[in-house]
């Protein structure tokens, strides 16, 4: 059933009130504190409808109601009025970055701290996905008989080391020629493009050094990123203890979530390619996250989407401030990451 304007007005007022006070909301509270234009009896009727429709749940001990995940979902998608960050708030965020050198790891670590302190939740940032980071320089170095060290310098500033084992001895001069050929042809492409498009084309063209043709497959395979190399930055555990102090089960759930780095990397990586700000509420997520919400957005290097950031907190978080905070921060981080990559 579609909600009427009356239903929407009551639902918004109740969710706003619950986010603010963190206790079940009754008709008297809505009548006294919100300019709804209905009598307490009419409000009670609407609240009963919203409960029947699955947007609210009763707390029998108090007589009030709280939003369900469905209620939060409708609130975020259709009712929330986004707060516009003030110039002072934007400057405060920007000043956090002026305190440090412009290095990628410092920027991302500071971002987790900024998101946490301004949202009263946990801030989280996923470092650049290595297969989406673009190549700045490649060097092949002879280590010993059958071993070559491949050094990949990425545009983000990340340096990757790969050991390649070959079936014959290659001189350093031969590897220098291969390195030069690779730099001439691979620079500016990401690892996915290099592995799936560029190197196959170079092997067909056969205009490079013979030694490249012999070890091209080994070079391509060695570039495959390891998900463990993606760095995770988290800040704000104390906020979670404060937010969930009366809800031990949900606190345990969110702490378990933050402790599972493999899950977090995979979860946030799904949003790297998607533009916009996304809100995941409870079981919208890939596993049970009862009582938990995540707001996330990607960040870019130039036009290339390379990572994701966001906040994790209780479902009753202040969405009208949290959504624009994540949006502004993602754009600011994109600007800084692009600047240091040049």
From Swiss-Prot:
Per the record, the GO terms for biological process are:
negative regulation of DNA-templated transcription
In Pfam terms, one family for this protein is HrcA
What Gene3D superfamilies does the annotation carry? 3.30.450.40, Heat-inducible transcription repressor hrca homolog, domain 3 (3.30.390.60), Winged helix-like DNA-binding domain superfamily/Winged helix DNA-binding domain (1.10.10.10)
GO molecular function terms noted in the UniProt entry: DNA binding
Domain of life (superkingdom) = Bacteria
Q: Where is the signal peptide?
A: none
Q: Any idea which UniProt keywords this protein has?
A: Repressor, Stress response, Transcription, Transcription regulation
Database matches in InterPro entries: GAF-like_dom_sf, HrcA, HrcA_C, WH-like_DNA-bd_sf, WH_DNA-bd_sf, WHTH_transcript_rep_HrcA_IDD
Q: Which family does it belong to?
A: Belongs to the HrcA family.
Q: Function of this protein?
A: Negative regulator of class I heat shock genes (grpE-dnaK-dnaJ and groELS operons). Prevents heat-shock induction of these operons.
Under which name does UniProt file this protein? Heat-inducible transcription repressor HrcA
Species this chain originates from = Leptospira interrogans serogroup Icterohaemorrhagiae serovar Lai (strain 56601)
Q: Give the gene name.
A: hrcA
């Amino acid at each position: 059933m579609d909600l009427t304007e009356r239903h929407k007005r009551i639902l918004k007022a109740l969710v706003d009130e619950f986010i603010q006070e963190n206790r079940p909301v009754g008709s008297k509270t809505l009548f006294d504190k919100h300019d709804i234009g209905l009598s307490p009896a009419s409000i009670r009727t609407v609240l009963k409808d919203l409960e029947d429709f699955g947007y609210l749940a009763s707390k029998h001990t108090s007589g009030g109601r709280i939003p369900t995940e469905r209620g939060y979902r409708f609130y975020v998608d259709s009712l929330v009025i986004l707060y516009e960050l003030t110039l002072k708030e934007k400057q405060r965020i920007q000043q956090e970055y002026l305190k440090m050198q412009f290095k990628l790891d410092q920027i991302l670590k500071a971002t987790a701290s900024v998101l946490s302190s301004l949202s009263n939740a946990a801030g989280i940032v996923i470092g650049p996905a290595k297969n989406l980071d673009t190549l700045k320089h490649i060097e092949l170095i002879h280590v010993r008989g059958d071993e070559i060290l491949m050094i990949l310098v990425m545009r983000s500033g990340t340096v990757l080391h790969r050991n390649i084992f070959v079936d014959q001895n290659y001189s350093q001069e031969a590897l220098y020629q291969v390195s030069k050929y690779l730099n001439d042809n691979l620079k500016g492409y990401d690892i996915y493009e290099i592995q799936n498009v560029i190197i196959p084309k170079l092997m067909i063209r056969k205009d490079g050094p013979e030694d490249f043709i012999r070890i091209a497959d080994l070079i391509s395979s060695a570039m495959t990123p390891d998900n463990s190399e993606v760095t995770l930055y988290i800040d704000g555990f104390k906020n979670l203890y404060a937010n969930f102090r009366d809800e031990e089960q949900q606190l345990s759930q969110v702490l378990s979530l933050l402790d599972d780095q493999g899950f977090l990397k995979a979860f946030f990586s799904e949003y790297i390619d998607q533009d916009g700000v996304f809100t995941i509420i409870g079981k919208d997520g890939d596993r049970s996250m009862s009582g938990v919400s995540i707001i996330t957005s990607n960040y870019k290097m130039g036009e290339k989407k390379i990572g994701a950031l966001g906040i994790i907190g209780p479902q009753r978080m202040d969405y009208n401030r949290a959504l624009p905070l994540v949006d502004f921060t993602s754009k600011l981080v994109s600007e800084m990451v692009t600047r240091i990559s040049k």
